[in-house]
Amino acid sequence: MGSVSVFVGLDYHQELVQVCVVDTAGRVLCNRAAGNDARAIVELATRHGDVQAAALDACCGASNLAQELVDSGWSVSLAHPGFVARMKQNPDKTDFSDARLLADLLRVGYLPKVWLAPERLRRLRRLVRYRQQLVDQRRDVKLRIRALLRENRLVSPVGVRPWTKGWLNWVHPAASRAAPSP
């Protein structure tokens, strides 16, 4: 049945991927769950025809699956999840309907696409995001410590700047004295 052109919509999840295959007329040929494995998805979709293109929402982990499908020879587009949600005509929020919508938007050319960044760039983005999270955590801890000092009315010595060695040498014993006894 490889002569029929089909479009594939994928609703990505950690364990399973809902795969919807539609033909050029928009008829659903298949809409069922497959394992989160590119080979299983390719096998399922190609049973129904020649895959012209596939689409999935851009979300955490989706770019890796998209890259695996591209490596399998597919043309894959990542969809902007916010725009796709607004294009939906009914309130039905199921994996079945989401995969169907992606396949249909791709088929008619209305899929709001986002860029699939190369793996190297995705790794750099992930590294920057993790670093920013650590910076935010450090800032939050410092703010909590300063709030606890204010709450206990502990004032640092004049001329000692916060977070310097001198301030840290002062704060540890001062905080220990202010802490309640168990």
Which stretches of residues belong to each language-model region?
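Short active-site oxyanion
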Residues: 6, 30, 50-54
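Short glycine-rich, Thr/Ser-proximal phosphate-binding strand/loop in the N-terminal lobe
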Residues: 16-39
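Short hydrophobic/aromatic-enriched beta-strand-loop microsegments
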Residues: 29-30, 72-81, 159
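Short, basic/hydrophobic alpha-helical segments
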Residues: 36-53
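Acidic beta-strand-to-loop metal/phosphate-binding motif
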Residues: 51-59, 102
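Short alpha-helix plus adjacent loop in nuclease-associated cores
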Residues: 77-129, 133, 167-174
